């Protein structure tokens, strides 16, 4: 068992869970993702089927920004994995998708205007997920 700090409960330490816990730690510690804006095992409905996104990262206004799909290290990241996360994105319409098996990581940025996506060379910092908007306090 391992304590999932986001779900605040102990969960079975499966190979996939090991990948999730390390990846979440990386996002929070090295990429500046706020722990309070990440949800693990988020339930969604795709068509008539209930599914669970492994992790969803939210913006400060509670809008979903990123879906992360984890696989155990011995599972290859095949087209089937990308198809799975794409189905989840049909519901959430995020700009960022990540698939990881702990050994390989792929980050994609959606390009909805051109109905395609781009593989990114690195996983973005949290501040790179959305254009920053600065508010001048005199305009409020």
Regions flagged by a language model, labelled:
Residues 1-96, 103-140:
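A short, conserved, highly charged catalytic patch centered on acidic carboxylates
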């Amino acid at each position: 068992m391992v304590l999932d700090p986001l779900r605040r409960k102990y969960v079975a330490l499966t190979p996939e869970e090991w990948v999730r816990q390390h990846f979440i730690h990386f996002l929070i510690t090295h990429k500046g993702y706020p722990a309070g804006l990440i949800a693990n095992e988020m339930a969604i409905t795709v068509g008539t089927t209930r599914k669970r996104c492994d992790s969803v990262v939210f913006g400060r206004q509670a809008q979903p920004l990123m879906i992360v799909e984890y696989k155990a290290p011995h599972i290859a990241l095949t087209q089937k994995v990308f198809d799975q996360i794409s189905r989840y994105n049909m519901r959430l319409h995020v700009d960022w998708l990540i698939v990881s098996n702990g050994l390989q990581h792929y980050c994609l940025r959606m390009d909805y205007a051109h109905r395609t996506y781009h593989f990114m060379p690195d996983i973005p910092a949290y501040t790179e997920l959305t254009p920053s908007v600065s508010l001048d306090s005199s305009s409020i």
